[in-house]
Curated annotation (Swiss-Prot):
Location of this chain's protein in the cell: Nucleus
Protein name listed in UniProt: Swi5-dependent recombination DNA repair protein 1 homolog
Disordered, as annotated region: 16-36
Polar residues bias: start-end ranges: 22-35
Role noted for this protein: Component of the SWI5-SFR1 complex, a complex required for double-strand break repair via homologous recombination. May act as a transcriptional modulator for ESR1.
MF-aspect GO terms: transcription coactivator activity
Transmembrane stretches, start-end: none
Similarity comment: family membership: Belongs to the SFR1/MEI5 family.
Coiled-coil boundaries: 130-155
Major place of residence: nucleus
One cellular component (GO) term of this entry: nucleus
Keywords: Coiled coil, DNA damage, DNA repair, Nucleus, Transcription, Transcription regulation
Amino acid sequence: MEEAACGKLTSLCHTPKDSGTAAPQRTSSGKQPMSATLRERLRKTRRSFTTNFAVAKRLKVDTEEKDCTDVDNRCLPKIGMDCSTLQDGSECLEQNCTVNTYFKSPLQENNLCESAENVVRVDLGQQQSLGEKVRLMKQVKEKEELLRRLKLVKMYRSKNNLSELQALIVKWRSSTQLMLYELQAAFSADGKKVSLSQLIDTFGLEDHLLHYSRAEEDFVDT
């Protein structure tokens, strides 16, 4: 097909100069050979076509790159908006968490206060229980001491005659009263006035055992 096209181009490119010359020789196949001028023109035409094709191809590539750039530019704002949306969402979540923490903190404070009050109540209850325990132990000790004395009295009564004990007590009282009178008289003889109350306090005696009256400064059953 190229040879046919070249033949047509050769017939079209004949100049008057060429018409005056002898007819070109034909090849064995019956086709007329291409002249040097036609080959040069065909080479230039082919080079121009190749150049235009390269320019068109480059323009196509540039157009595709521009389209991709436009697509990327259209996508970037969307991605930016998505990131902004995500950031806003995270901020909202943080605000919600802060609000929840704010609402929970009074409850937690109330729980802490209730726990502290419960601890104080437990401590007070333990202190009261401890005080009650000490008081009961003291009462038990007093009762045990009273019971011990009653047992001793019962034992003495079972072993001794009460009338004899009463007689001994009366004898001890009268002898003690007499001794105190004699001491008072002895101090008075030396020029020292001493009362019976001072003598009783000096010896550590009890008034009710001696039947002594401090108001009258004398024994009431002498």
